[in-house]
Amino acid sequence: MIAFNLACYASVTGRIEEAKERLRNAIDLNKDVRILALDDEDLRPLWDWITDLQ
């Protein structure tokens, strides 16, 4: 969950590319994180990107 939390922090501070990288790492560790991310307001700027992930 640390990678997920760091992704949230990066997102709310406008560091979108860093947020994507950290979220990708979190999803690689636990696929269920993708579902959590789509419900987290901190990650709203990434929702389209998350939806497009394979």
Model-predicted segments: where are they?
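Canonical positions in the second alpha-helix
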Residues: 25-26
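Start-of-helix register in tetratricopeptide repeats
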Residues: 1, 35-36
